[in-house]
Amino acid sequence: MQLYAINTDKSDARAVAEYLVNPASAASGVIYYNGTTEDHYLYSYDTQSGTVQTLFEYNMWYPTLSGSSIYYLDTENNYQLCRYDLTDGSNTVLTTDRVDLFNIAGSYVYYQKNDPSSPALMRMGIDGSNPEIVAEGNYSDINVTSSYVYFHSFGADTPVYQTSTYGPISVMTFDAAKAAALQAID
C-alpha cells in the first residue's frame, strides 16, 4: 500500500511515499516501516513534520517498535529475530532460529520458530534470554493481551489456544472462540 496523508477535515490529501509501505508500527506520531522497493532499510515518517528519515541501513522485515527498540526479522541472515536500539544504534541478535512471525508482550517476545524437524511456538525475554517452548508445531496469528496469548495451528482457524502472557506456560483451548465459530456457521 502507498502511504498518503490527509487532514482531519479531508483537505490537503497528498502522497507521502510513492512506493509500497508496510506500516508495521507507529507511536507518538511516527510511523516505522521497512523499504519494499530498492531496499528493506528501516524508515520513519513523522506525521507532524511530514519528513521521511532513514534510521538504519540494513535489510529487515516487519519492524516493530517496543520501548526505544525496533524488533525485526533479519532478511540477510535466515530471518533471525533482532533488536535495533533507536537511542544508541546498537543491534542485537535475539535468536538465530529462523522466525516466521512474532509479537511482543511487555517483557516477552513470542515467536514461531521455523525448523523442519522441530517447529515450535517459543517465548523468550525481550533481550533474547531464557527461550522456552510454548507449544510444539506450527502456529500463526500470535495475539497478545495483558492476560493471555492466543494462537492457532497454521492452516486451521480452530481450535484457538491460549496461555498466560506472563505466568507459567499452560496451553489450553480457548473454548469461547470455538463456540463463536460454531455459532457463526449456524
Predicted regions and their residues:
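Blade-level signature of beta-propeller repeat domains, shared across WD40, Kelch, NHL, RCC1
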Residues: 136-185
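Acidic, low-complexity, intrinsically disordered interaction modules
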Residues: 127-130, 148-150
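Structural motif
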Residues: 1-5, 38-44, 77-83, 117-122, ...
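Repeated scaffold domains used in trafficking and secretory/extracellular systems
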Residues: 18-28, 57-67, 96-106, 137-146, ...
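Generic beta-strand structural signal
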Residues: 8, 25-26, 36-37, 45-47, ...
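Residue position within the beta-strands of beta-propeller blades
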Residues: 31-34, 71-73, 109-112, 150-152
